[in-house]
Structures are given as structure tokens and as C-alpha cells.
């Protein structure tokens, strides 16, 4: 099945419907009829809707994927498979991690190993702490990634979505 066309899993709007907004009215509005940013609506051909290829691109790839992603059902976890509880760092551990971060925002493998032994932590706990600290600073600063800004200017990167109906009501 062509990923650009709606198939059995993704029914096209009813034949008597001329616009995408007609099919988005009602309680069972079609989530496929979302517009990203100020993108043009899909092209209607006979009884199917052809979506532009970029709609099927994932956030990790600029190539179209095979279509809408599906989730696997979560299986019930046994007690052994439960998530590890959140690490509660001691005041001493936090003080050392913060001091290390002040010296260098990116920790080397050797330094991570040494610190893990000295603080009685796993290397992965230290690695994740550093990642989270960098992410927190980045989020707080409000700085945007240069590539993201460039793509947003071209209308290719905008994670906000509105339904067709909402867009018409706001005009």
C-alpha cells in the first residue's frame, strides 16, 4: 500500500464531503485531518487522500516512513521487570556532580568511571545526570537550535498542530 494514500486502516473522508473540515466535524473527527503549521491541506483524488511525503517523515529521519506509527501493547510486567526507582542523590554526590559540571559540561569516559567509583554510583547514573543538567540549562535559556529555526522559517519544522475546524474558526 502506498504510504501517501489512505487505505483500509485510514478511511478517506465521505464522498459527499468537499472539504477536509466537513469530515472533521462531529464527535469522531478524523485525526488524519490535522494541519501542521500553515501547511496546505491534502490533495483529494477520487475516494482517497494523497498526503505529501513529508507527513510520513519521522522526527529522526527526513525520509518517509512506511506510514503512521503503531504502538505495541504493553505487556504486564513481573516484579523483576519493574523500573528501577529514581535515584535520590545525596547532598555530597550532588555537590561533587555540580562541581564537576562547572569544570566541564561534558564528562570524559575516564572521569565518569573515576567519579562513579568515588561516589558509589553507576556510570550510567552519572552520564544521565550530566545529560539532564545540560537539557535543563538549554530549556531554561530558551535558546532555539539553529537548524530548527532555519527549518521553521521554511515551514518544515513546526510541532504545533491545529485541526482544520479550529483554524477556520480562528480566522
Curated annotation (Swiss-Prot):
It is found in: Nucleus. Residues 15-29 have a biased composition (Low complexity). One of its GO terms (biological process) is neuron differentiation. PANTHER family: HOMEOBOX PROTEIN ENGRAILED, HOMEOBOX PROTEIN ENGRAILED-1. Required for proper formation of the apical ectodermal ridge and correct dorsal-ventral patterning in the limb. Residues 1-41, 60-86 are annotated as: Disordered. InterPro entries: Engrailed_Homeobox_TFs, HD, HD_engrailed, HD_metazoa, Homeobox-engrailed_C-terminal, Homeobox-engrailed_CS, Homeobox_CS, Homeodomain-like_sf. Pfam families: Engrail_1_C_sig, Homeodomain. The lineage of its organism: Eukaryota, Metazoa, Chordata, Craniata, Vertebrata. This is Homeobox protein engrailed-1-B. The keyword DNA-binding applies. Gene3D superfamilies: Homeodomain-like. One of its GO terms (cellular component) is nucleus. One of its GO terms (molecular function) is RNA polymerase II cis-regulatory region sequence-specific DNA binding. Keywords: Developmental protein, DNA-binding, Homeobox, Nucleus. Belongs to the engrailed homeobox family. It comes from the Eukaryota. Residues 82-141 bind DNA.
